[in-house]
Amino acid sequence: IHVYERLRDLYVAEKSREVKKSGTDEAASVCELSDQEEETLAVCGLLHDACKINFYVPGTRNVKNEKTGQWEKVPCYTIDDQLPYGHGEKSVYIVSGFMRLSREEAMAIRWHMGAWQDGEKQNAGAAFGMYKLAVLTHLADMQATYLDENES
C-alpha cells in the first residue's frame, strides 16, 4: 500500500507543478483526479509486484546456536520461481492475464525497478522519457522501500 500512497502523492504533486507552470488558473481543481487517473494509480501502485505472488515460500534452514554449538532448524522463506521471467515483465504478464493494461500502465509496471533489475539503462531511460508514470512509479517504489519500509 505504501507504493500506491507514494505514487498518488507524487502524481498529484507533478500534476500541480505542471498546472502552475502552464500559468492557467486551475489550482483549485488540480488535486481532483479523474476516475481513470485514480484507477491507473491503483493498478500501478498495487500490482507492480504481482510477480512476488507465490514466489516466496516458507522453508527452514540450519543455524548454529551460539550458546549450545548445536545446529538448529529455523523458519525462513525460500524462492520458488515457477515462472522464470524478468521481475517487471513477469508482473505485466501476470496482471495482463486478468485485465487489459494501457501501454503507460504496462511501462510503469515493467520499469518500476528502473535499471536495477537487469541493467538495461538505455531502455529504462527511454521508457522514463516517454512515460512519466514509469518515472513516478519507480520513485514511489524507492520511497516506499527506503523511507517507509526500511527496517534498519
Language model regions located:
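Glycine-rich active-site/cofactor-binding loop and its immediate structural neighborhood
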Residues: 2-7, 11
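Divalent metal-dependent catalytic cores for phosphoryl transfer on phosphate-bearing substrates
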Residues: 12-150
